[in-house]
Amino acid sequence: PIERIDQKLKAIEQTIRSYTNNNFQNRKIRSAGVVSSSKLNVINKLYGLSIGDTVQITESMFNDGLYTVKGIEENTIVLDKELIDEGHILITKVEYPDDVIECCINLCEWEVKNRGKVGIKAETLSRHSVTYFDQDASNQMNGYPVSLLGCLKPYRKARC
C-alpha cells in the first residue's frame, strides 16, 4: 500500500538526516510565522517555495518537524498535516542535493531486494549454493550497509 511506501520513505529520510547530522535547510528561504486554524501565516513571503516542497518547522512548542507544502496563497501556507495553533514558529525550505536523492533511491532498492535476506549467511538448494554479504556492526549503519551510505560522506556534519 502507498501508506507503507510513504512511511518507509520518511524513515529513510530520517536515517539520512540522522547519519549526516545535516538538516539540508536552505536558510535563504526562511521566515518566522504563526499558526492559526491549522494554516501557517508567514511574516515574509517565501519566494522559491512551491507546492510539493519539503519544509521544516523549528522553534515551535507543538509543530516541530518536516512537512510537505500542499498550498500557497500570498503569506499563507497549507501543509500536509494538521498544525496546532501557536504564536511563533520558524519555517525553512529543505532541499536535498541530487546525489542524496540518488542515495535514497539506492536505499529503497536495497530495502526491497535485500531486507528479507538480512541475517541469512548462505542458502543451498540442491547443488546450487549462494553466500550472502555478512552484515554486522562493523559494516552497517542504521540497518543499511555502510557501502550504500558512502555517498553521504560529503554531507556529514560534526556533532556539537
Which ranges hold each PLM region?
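Conserved short "hinge" loops at termini or chain/domain junctions
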Residues: P1-E102, R115, S138-C160
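Conserved, mostly hydrophobic/aromatic
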Residues: R127
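Short acidic, Pro/Gly- and aromatic-enriched capping/linker segments at domain boundaries
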Residues: K113-K121
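Short Cys/His-centered divalent metal-binding micro-motifs
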Residues: C108
